[in-house]
UniProtKB/Swiss-Prot annotation:
Cofactor: Mg(2+)
Record GO biological process: mRNA catabolic process; RNA processing
Family listed: Belongs to the polyribonucleotide nucleotidyltransferase family.
Reactions performed catalytically: RNA(n+1) + phosphate = RNA(n) + a ribonucleoside 5'-diphosphate
The S1 motif domain, residue ranges: 622-690
Major localisation: cytoplasm
Protein name: Polyribonucleotide nucleotidyltransferase
Gene: pnp
Lineage: superkingdom: Bacteria
Keywords of the record: Cytoplasm, Magnesium, Metal-binding, Nucleotidyltransferase, RNA-binding, Transferase
Domain KH: 553-612
Lineage, broadest ranks: Bacteria, Pseudomonadati, Pseudomonadota, Gammaproteobacteria, Oceanospirillales
SMART domains: KH, S1
Length: 702
């Protein structure tokens, strides 16, 4: 096999695709290089589908190797383990735009493996992985209606849209968006933003689609040089006689069942109709198997529901295309949590809780970009009971990780800075009922629970899921889609944001792309729905509570001179250990002089704060202090006025009259009130007792 390479310019980056040198036994393999990022994508496709298989078994695995940045993995085994959250999210990012481009009816197993071989810590390798996957599929011969292109977009007021920004570029960006699509249409969007307008978000999608054309053209040219012959595969012809039998015998009953608005009752009735069809059409000698009938029945269901929407009839639950389901909001329903909310929208329901912790509770991660500390976590749980099913319980699945990340993107932009609110925040969304858009219910619940916990959000956030039914003779954009509309429709378009703008946008297309008009309509309807939901939420709670929950840890933060850190710690940690033992508080010190104090109650944190103030305080001229005489000398007395700080009361400053001996007036251990006269350049403190008037002594309080 000969080696083929293709080099092209993609914005400011030079991209090289190579095949024929590495992983030659895979069905398709491409090494993509963008700057320092080198990602190997391999594709293997089974030549035939497993007997009786009724789904497309596509799996995508993105894996980061520590050697890619010259590191040895941590831990006892010193090798990579289970996929990180970043690897899981990127695997989903690659999967979503390629899945709709395999032809309907293709059931052969396909596995994509993307391995980051080399990169630098300022670059995300996901775009290289997506381009490598696109190229590997396009040259593999597997039926695939690509290629796709992919691009990351940043945005700021000075530069406008920025193509494929690095991590450092994204630090000042108002947008982080990844877009994938074909030559003609957009297939996938994943983004988080700082309250951008609908026009700015749509502009970013269109900008990315325009810029990715260079990559799509290059992959097409690359495939022309080295692609394997396309597999001789054709979809199995539809069984017309079975379709006709179902249409004539059961279409009316299916349509009647879809008039039932309550989900479980509707499913039960559809089950009755399906069982009747199977019983009537499947016989031992018959030409139809049970799998044939149930498969054709599902296709008829889909066709009926979609046709109803296109024809302008009411949706499954009786709504029109723009109406949001009834909303119910409760906060503070769980007594011992720091913040809680119950958000219900139709038959979708989430209980969100907010827990406040210390900086020691923050999430530590160690990836290719190095170690990082995350003080905000949002975890999404989707138990099987939420859809009335029995199911596997245990570890977190890819879907839960993806939905949790989307909900996190939705609220990230409104979080206070650590300086404003130095707590670690963990939000957990428990989906207790699901019938569409549970991730957007999690956004609403997260916003509500944090406000209930006293987290000073910049603004409340709400989310909504939009859907699409598109046929040759028209299309309809649906607001607040049900689970069935998601399953039977062509688009899942989720938007989260505040009253001012969008904070997260996710789009997945199940057909071969949509155009600008559809996206514009979807964004417009989403704005209307989001505004409505925010109004409903504001009826219950519109701002953060003025105080954090009494169940939350008490926290105080002060800034001290970094030179004073050693004084707070003390010899061998004696001072800080003493403060902790006396007050019960925990203390964290940063190199920049930031001191964080955590305690179970305010009294403990205040006591620790006072002690640190005393240790780090500087003597102020003309200020009164109550001190203790620590040593006597012929020329005066040394008085301790602050922890670790002694000053001298000269014999002439002890009393108005002339005294013969210091011991006539003072003794060691005696408490006295003194005034600071001066602090010289070497830090020596001059004190006076005689300059303190009787009135000042009487008025002085510690």
């Amino acid at each position: 096999m000969s080696i083929t390479t293709k080099t092209f310019q993609f914005g400011n980056d030079t991209v090289t695709l190579e095949t024929g040198r590495i992983a030659r036994q895979a069905t398709g393999a491409v090494l993509c290089t963008i700057g320092d990022a080198q990602v190997l994508a391999t594709v293997v496709g089974a030549k035939s589908a497993k007997a009786g298989q009724d789904f497309f078994p596509l799996s995508v695995h993105y894996q980061e190797r520590a050697y890619a940045v010259g590191k040895i993995p941590g831990g006892f085994l010193k090798r990579e383990g289970r996929p990180s959250e970043k690897e899981t999210l990127t695997s989903r990012l690659i999967d979503r735009p390629i899945r709709p481009l395999f032809p309907k009816g293709f059931m052969n197993e396909v596995q994509v493996v993307c391995t980051v071989m080399s990169t630098n810590t300022n670059l995300d390798a996901d775009i290289a992985a997506m381009l490598a996957t696109s190229a590997a599929l396009t040259i593999s011969g597997i039926p695939f209606n690509g290629p796709i292109g992919a691009a990351r977009v940043g945005f700021n007021d000075e530069s406008g849209y920025v193509l494929n920004p690095s991590y450092s570029d994204l630090d000042g960006s108002l947008l982080d968006m990844v877009v994938a699509g074909t030559k003609d249409a957009v297939l996938m969007v994943e983004s988080e933003a700082q309250e951008l307008t609908e026009d700015e978000m749509l502009g970013a999608v269109l900008y990315a689609h325009k810029e990715m054309q260079a990559a799509i053209s290059a992959i097409t040219e690359f495939a022309a040089e080295c692609a394997k012959p396309r597999w001789d595969w054709e979809a199995e012809a539809a069984n017309v006689s079975l379709a006709d039998a179902l249409q004539s015998g059961y279409a009316a009953q299916i349509e009647e069942a879809y008039g039932i608005s309550e989900k479980m009752a509707r499913y039960a009735q559809l089950g009755v109709v399906r069982d009747a069809a199977v019983a009537a059409l499947v016989t031992e000698e018959g030409e139809f198997t049970e799998a044939d009938v149930t498969g054709a029945f599902s296709k008829l269901e889909k066709r009926i529901v979609r046709r109803r929407v296109i024809d302008g009839k009411p949706r499954i639950d009786g709504r029109d295309n723009k109406t949001v389901r009834p909303i119910n909001v409760e906060v503070g329903l769980l007594s011992k949590t720091h913040g809680s909310a119950l958000f219900t929208r139709g038959e979708t329901q989430a209980i969100a809780t907010c827990t406040l912790g210390t900086s020691r509770d923050s999430q530590m991660t160690d990836g290719l970009t190095g170690e990082s500390k995350d003080s905000f976590m949002l975890h999404y749980n989707f138990p099987p009971y939420s859809v009335g099913e029995c199911g596997r319980m245990g570890g977190v699945g890819r879907r839960e990780i993806g939905h949790g990340r989307l909900a996190r993107r939705g609220v990230q932009a409104v979080l206070p800075s650590e300086d404003e609110f130095p707590y670690t925040i963990r939000v957990v969304s428990e989906i207790t009922e699901s019938n569409g858009s549970s991730s957007m219910a999690s956004v609403c619940g997260a916003s509500l629970s944090m406000m209930d916990a006293g987290v000073p959000l910049k603004a409340p956030v709400a989310g909504i899921a939009m859907g699409l039914i598109k046929e040759d003779d028209g299309f309809a954009v649906l607001t607040d889609i049900l689970g069935d509309e998601d399953h039977l429709g062509d688009m899942d378009f989720k938007v989260a944001g505040t009253a001012e703008g969008i904070t997260a946008l996710q789009m997945d297309i199940k057909i071969e792309g949509i155009n600008e008009e559809i996206m514009d309509i979807a964004l417009s309807q989403a704005l209307e729905a989001r505004t409505h939901i925010l109004r409903e939420m504001a009826k219950v709670i519109g701002y953060a509570r003025p105080e954090v929950s009494p169940n939350a840890p008490s926290m105080a933060t002060i800034k001290i001179d970094p030179e004073k850190i050693r004084d707070v710690i003390g010899k061998g940690g004696a001072t800080i250990r003493s403060i902790t033992e006396q007050t019960g508080a925990s203390i964290d010190l940063d190199d920049d002089g930031t001191v964080r104090i955590y305690a179970a109650d305010k009294a403990s944190s205040d006591a620790a704060l006072l002690k640190i103030h005393e240790i780090t305080a500087e003597a102020e001229v003309d200020k009164l202090y109550k001190g203790k005489v620590v040593r006597l000398a012929e020329f005066g007395a040394f008085v301790n006025i602050l922890p670790g700080k002694d000053g001298l009361v000269h014999i002439s400053q002890i009393a108005e009259e002339r005294i013969r001996a210091v011991t006539d007036f003072l003794s060691e251990g005696q408490e006295v009130i003194v005034k600071v006269l001066d602090v010289d350049a070497r830090g020596r403190i001059k004190l006076s007792m005689k300059d303190v008037t009787e009135e000042e002594k009487a008025a002085y309080t510690e």
